[in-house]
């Protein structure tokens, strides 16, 4: 009676937004998009890994390596136990300076439409709500004057594209991913707080479902003494009771799995 009215609205939003997410998720500039903008790699004159390792600080061994070519420069992205390094394949080259000209070149790779305006962001917004991105400030937000109203976010520190959206993906995110994942900027930028809120909401929902299932089964047992299926005689009341218990089991698994997806357990 206490939790039901409030949490029924929350569950309704979760279910409906989950249906939307089958077809539309949170917009992002994913790896496939980024790869499509890269140059084709040439295998000629590439140094060996032994040569690259010699250009690392002493006593550091390569644990992971990625090689790509972008805007005319081939770079090894190296991870070791002590840190990460970006090393040009050509030892005579240096890594590019991330200046405004390079930022514009990156933007033109993603969208050739005219630019309506560019914002310099020093706070996170709805489409980059992740706290780790604060390290990239200022972030340049390009607004393109195309029919799809694309928006592109580029880091001023690395020159990397952080997000790419259009009006369609933003619209569906408001109906799907944002309410379903509780992706509100003020909450999501604090990852620890966001996890706690989702876990607590799911946990309280589990308690509510267990209580409802218990009471529903108890009423079934009481009704059996009078040779009835349900103690409720009115058609809608009776079927609300029966379907409520059955659907409550489903809602319980939904809440519990949502809670465990973020809960830190051994």
Regions found by a protein language model. Give the residues of each.
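Conserved histidines in hydrophobic membrane contexts and catalytic metal-binding motifs
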Residues: 1-266
